[in-house]
Amino acid sequence: MMNKIKNPIYINFLNLFLNISLYFFVITNLDINKFYALLFYLSSFFLIFYSFNFKTIFFEKFLSIFVWLGFPFKLAIPYVALSFGYEINLFPENSSYNNFSKDVYNDAINFSSCGILGFIFASIVRKKYIFFYSSEKNLIKNNIWFFYEKYKFKILFIYIITFISINFFNLYFEIYQKGISFDFAPKFLIVIFKWLLLMGLSSFACCFVYYDLVKKKNYKFTSVLFLLESFFSNISILSRAFVFNVGILFISFFHLFKNNVRIKFSVVLSLLIFAILLIFLNINITSKLRNCVVNYQNIDKIEKIFFSKNCLVSQKKLLSNEISGTLNKISSLSFARWVGIDSMMAVMSKKESLNLSYYIFFLKEKKILYEKSYYEKYFLNQDKSKTHIINTNHIILPGFVSYQSISGSKFFVFLSCFVLGIIGAYLEKFSYRYSYNNFILSAFISYLFVFRMIHFGYLPFNTFIYFLAIIFTFLQFKIYNFILHKIKIL
């Protein structure tokens, strides 16, 4: 019980200390309105506070972490780094946007605060009227659970073979990689592979971990399996976001710990060490595979990109003199790549153009090959995409809060963020209910939704399709349960 009480106190103290420290770094280095900055950091503190205390859900935890990293943290970190003798560019994608006026900073802080307040009010409403987890973790035994218990080793063996095969075929046939447009056919296979690699395979791993964790069986093995599947899938799609999948697992452990469910410290520690090693390898390998795309010289495209001679030679040098380079890459990603305040300032720099009609114009954006996104064209003054032999499609995204600011209305930003918070709460509620109380799967579902909205801002209609895919990801288990009931296999 003492651990249950102490734990939030430590988190709250750290939260308060960090926000106060960042506030003083900002007001001593930037010519901005100190009162606006105070409200900005106070609202950031309360967002984390409400997300990690009293009737918490995973959606709000993930959302508050991403928002905090993208806004208060990213605004202050260049000056924190400077005090230690390091230099960090607040705008790594567009260095010409370093000289903003005082008014732009103040407007960006005010609009950001409105969005954060919208999330806070949504959290308050959610706790009172919508959904929160009970302290009891009751496993709802269903046909899927009985099937897993009866055929566990066969299921896990088939699963391992399946995810290894899917990842290999995806890389070899170049079916789906982030930021790259291939001409793979048939198109329905791209959709299937995309769903499996982004959501499907991991959703099954969430079930395996949940069943073993709740029944207090060998959850270490299925946790390792969850990490390995996420690791290989992220490499296969050239994503460096594996660290967030790690976060899902450990935030789930933290959720159990808060509710006084005992988990072996030695198991958590060994999983953490293993996860850190995989994070290092994920960033290293993915960076090299991305370089294979950029440096690909086979005009006839006879040679497979990721299995070409040059690419394979590059991979063999994986750990040769690469440690410092990978650490620098991790440092860069940790400090500069969060989506938030930089895009808000880019939007506020064109404040005279912002209105609801302009916002609606952005909502109608359509994909045009070799063209930059609307955000890049109209706010970052970028035009044509760079062309390579392989058609890369790297997009700079403003994020949900900054995107809503295109309306030019603080109230609209507040209301949009409030509505998003309510939608996220209901999504987690339904995913928890329809997955038979599988809180690890509902954590994964909430992460998928938060990650998409934090990186919102290109082809908005595609986000609706992505949302439907998320809903299917947890509803599929209702379908499997129904099928098992009908065929009476148990």
Map each language-model feature to its residues.
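N-terminal "leader" segments that precede or initiate the main folded domain
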Residues: 1-140, 247-284, 459-483
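Membrane-embedded catalytic interface detector for glycan/lipid assembly enzymes
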Residues: 31-34, 90-100, 123-263, 267, ...
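Central hydrophobic cores of alpha-helical transmembrane segments
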Residues: 61-72, 222-230, 267-274, 417-421, ...
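Small-residue-enriched transmembrane helix-hairpin modules in multi-pass membrane proteins
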Residues: 183-187, 279-420
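Hydrophobic alpha-helical segments
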Residues: 392-490
